[in-house]
Amino acid sequence: MELHVRYEGDDDPEKCTARKLARFDLAALHRTGRETPAGVVLNPHAERALSPADDTDMLVALDCSWETAGRAMFEIDGEHRALPFLVAANPVNYGQPFQLNTVEAFAGALAILGRWERAEELLSKFTWGHTFLELNEEPLRRYADCEDSSEVVAVQQAYLDAGED
């Protein structure tokens, strides 16, 4: 599966997971929307959740600061899907739900799409990478067992409801 990143370059280059993926030839960076190929776009503002029904040969992520990640930033061609409830393991946003960096977003999407080994490959480039799969193993496996977006949303809601108890 091809991984493409619409790269804004507005965060710390030393902490940028997209740049590191590109250095290892695991993702391609694109500086403009026109350069970025259409695929399944991981978009936190999307109306539909990513599910195994979205299996594809190309994932696209936007790499930018969370401070600038408004809806307008995600004007990228393709089918837009939101990742369901997952918890960040990266040092910047550790423990924060939904505040994933680019490699975590790709890894979460790959796991949901049944490509667990590829997710592990990406995360192996980061000292904290294994922690992402450890923190999210149960929900990722449950999301991967879903048929479609509505089932993923139901599983997500169960996690959100459990957190309120």
Curated annotation (Swiss-Prot):
One of its GO terms (molecular function) is S-adenosyl-L-methionine binding. It comes from Halobacterium salinarum (strain ATCC 700922 / JCM 11081 / NRC-1) (Halobacterium halobium). Keywords: Cytoplasm, Ribosome biogenesis, rRNA processing, S-adenosyl-L-methionine, Transferase. Belongs to the TDD superfamily. TSR3 family. This is 16S rRNA aminocarboxypropyltransferase. GO terms for cellular component: cytoplasm. InterPro entries: RNaseL-inhib-like_metal-bd_dom, Tsr3-like, Tsr3_C. Its EC number is 2.5.1.157.
